[in-house]
């Protein structure tokens, strides 16, 4: 009976140790998950720009890059960006090409799902698009063209796709 108690005590202590090891950085892990690639990082920085500028997106690449360069280096590091290499953020990891970004997109305090970051080349005829609601979706050229022209936001495009 004593041996069983000792084994249960060991299992209990190990369980507490493991829970402590994995729960300590949950906020950091969540933040990292929301910024797992350059599309998501750019979308989140675009949204942050909007928050600080009356929900208007940056007017051009120069304004966006200036905003990122002036952003807190500590906050950039927390989302996986080397503050000394912010230009690398504008290159897609999947295809190695620069992103296309829709500048001047109006956001909303209530949230919106407008597309703002686009793969320029993509893979196998499909291109990833990053939306202001922090989602990303791989689309074909026709949907890409519609979203790039601002013809639909992410929700409208998804409804249209589901209804066809």
Model-derived features with residue positions:
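Bacterial N-terminal signal peptides
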Residues: 7-20
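Active-site and channel-lining beta-strand-loop segments
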Residues: 127-134
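Positively charged n-region of N-terminal signal peptides that target proteins for export
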Residues: 1-7
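Short, small/polar residue-rich loop motifs at catalytic or cofactor-binding pockets
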Residues: 122-125
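Conserved hydrophobic/amphipathic alpha-helical signal-anchor segments
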Residues: 21-93, 100-104, 108-109, 135-163
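Short, hydrophobic/aromatic-rich segments at coil-to-beta transitions
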Residues: 111-116
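Generic detector of short, well-ordered, non-transmembrane alpha-helical segments enriched
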Residues: 17-19, 60, 130
């Amino acid at each position: 009976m004593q041996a069983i108690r000792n084994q249960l005590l060991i299992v209990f202590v190990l369980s507490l140790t493991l829970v402590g090891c994995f729960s300590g950085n949950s906020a950091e892990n969540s933040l990292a998950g929301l910024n797992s690639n350059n599309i998501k990082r750019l979308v989140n920085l675009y949204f942050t720009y909007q928050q600080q500028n009356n929900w208007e997106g940056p007017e051009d690449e120069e304004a966006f890059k200036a905003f990122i360069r002036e952003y807190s280096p500590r906050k950039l590091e927390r989302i996986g960006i080397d503050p000394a290499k912010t230009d690398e953020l504008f290159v897609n990891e999947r295809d190695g090409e620069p992103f296309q970004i829709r500048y001047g997109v109006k956001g909303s305090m209530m949230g919106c799902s407008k597309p703002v970051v686009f793969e320029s080349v993509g893979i196998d005829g499909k291109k990833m698009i990053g939306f202001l609601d922090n989602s990303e979706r791989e689309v074909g050229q026709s949907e890409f063209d519609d979203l790039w022209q601002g013809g639909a936001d992410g929700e409208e495009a998804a409804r249209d796709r589901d209804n066809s």
